[in-house]
């Protein structure tokens, strides 16, 4: 079974995808760099978790 992500991660990721969908890709490293530019995220761990969820969602949307 997979891991369950917190609501904060899901909500933030979905808002960012709606705003900046054309900037995100299916590559985790690229999404991490985009997040650094686009959003004000306090910790590296939170940034990585949001980037991972965005990557997951972008793969589903293709």
Swiss-Prot record:
GO terms for biological process: translation. PROSITE patterns: RIBOSOMAL_S17E. InterPro entries: Ribosomal_eS17, Ribosomal_eS17_CS, Ribosomal_eS17_sf. GO terms for cellular component: cytosol; ribonucleoprotein complex; ribosome. Gene3D superfamilies: Ribosomal protein S17e-like (1.10.60.20). Transmembrane segments: none annotated. It comes from the Archaea. Keywords: Ribonucleoprotein, Ribosomal protein. GO terms for molecular function: structural constituent of ribosome. Belongs to the eukaryotic ribosomal protein eS17 family. This is Small ribosomal subunit protein eS17. The lineage of its organism: Archaea, Methanobacteriati, Methanobacteriota, Methanomada group, Methanococci. The gene is rps17e.
């Amino acid at each position: 079974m997979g891991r369950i992500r917190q609501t904060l991660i899901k909500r933030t990721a979905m808002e960012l995808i709606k705003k900046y969908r054309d900037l995100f890709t299916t590559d985790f490293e690229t999404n991490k760099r985009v997040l650094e530019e686009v959003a004000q995220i306090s910790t590296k761990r939170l940034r990585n978790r949001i980037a991972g969820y965005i990557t997951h969602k972008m793969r589903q949307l293709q």
